């Protein structure tokens, strides 16, 4: 039950981040960890997973 998050979205466990413009749909974020956030510079900021 995964979905794609865009830059700036808060990601959920197992989400695949597809950051950036459509021409480069995967410019740095993939396999987000729980609670990660896709930032505008296409990096996933890590944080602690709360269950």
From Swiss-Prot:
Protein's organism: Dictyostelium discoideum
Domain of life: Eukaryota
InterPro entries reported for this sequence: Zym1-like (IPR049529)
Protein name as catalogued: Uncharacterized protein DDB_G0288281
């Amino acid at each position: 039950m995964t979905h794609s998050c865009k830059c700036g979205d808060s990601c959920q466990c197992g989400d695949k981040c597809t950051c950036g413009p459509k021409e480069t749909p995967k410019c740095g974020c993939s396999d987000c960890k729980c609670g990660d956030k896709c930032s505008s510079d296409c990096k996933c900021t890590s944080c602690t997973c709360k269950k």
